[in-house]
Design a protein with these regions (language model features):
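Bacterial N-terminal signal peptides that target proteins for export
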Residues: 1-8
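C-terminal motif of bacterial Sec signal peptides marking the signal peptidase cleavage site
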Residues: 15-18
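Bacterial signal peptide processing site
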Residues: 20-22
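Membrane-proximal juxtamembrane linkers immediately C-terminal to transmembrane helices
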Residues: 26-32
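N-terminal segment of the mature soluble domain
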Residues: 32-77
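Sec/Tat-exported extracytoplasmic proteins
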Residues: 53-57, 104-108, 154-163
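Surface-exposed short loop/turn segments
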Residues: 72-117, 121-141
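C-terminal/domain-edge helix-coil "capping" segments
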Residues: 130-168
Length: 168
């Protein structure tokens, strides 16, 4: 009976890996993206990049000379705006917007992607009740983190696409 449970568990794990299943946030990096140098990123973006690369075999390097790719952050913009009001005039729903403008350079300093912008958005409901203020603040913090992570995934996808064009 113990053998059959173990066999079922092993078979389930094999089927998961065979279907391409991977953990959320895990990214398969091409060789040129395994070492990246990040220039001029905010602390929040730097943290999201570190988390993304920690889940892979990639590494963030401290010098552009060591990098297979260079991410040059040109501009970052974060905004929270009201998208609906209650009958008493308080904000009920907010939209969070994160916009990242960047260049991607290869290891020789050649531009792969120039002046690209990624914009990610999310919204959340806030009833403005004193009992939920703290939880809504925490919800916004989590959503901000997810927006940064989404932007990082988009940068990596664009980098991968450009590398496929360069090295088919």
């Amino acid at each position: 009976r113990l053998v059959s449970r173990s066999s079922v568990l092993v078979m389930a794990l094999l089927m998961l890996t065979a279907c391409g299943y991977h953990l959320r946030g895990a990214i398969d990096l091409p060789e040129a993206l395994k070492t990246i140098y990040v220039k001029s990123a905010s602390p929040e973006l730097s943290t999201a990049i570190e988390r993304a690369f920690r889940a892979t075999t990639g590494e963030i390097v401290t010098s552009p000379d060591q990098a297979g790719m260079i991410l040059n952050v040109l501009d970052e913009y974060f905004q929270r705006r009201t998208i609906s009001l209650s009958s008493t005039g308080f904000s009920n729903e907010y939209e969070l917007v994160y916009r990242l403008t960047f260049d991607l350079l290869d290891s020789e300093g050649n531009t792969l992607v120039s002046n690209q912008t990624i914009e990610v958005t999310d919204s959340y409901f806030n009833a403005q009740r004193s009992s939920t203020v703290l939880s809504k603040d925490n919800e916004e913090i989590v959503l901000r983190k997810e927006l940064y992570e989404s932007a990082v995934r988009s940068v990596i996808q664009r980098a991968r696409a450009e590398l496929m064009k360069k090295f088919p």
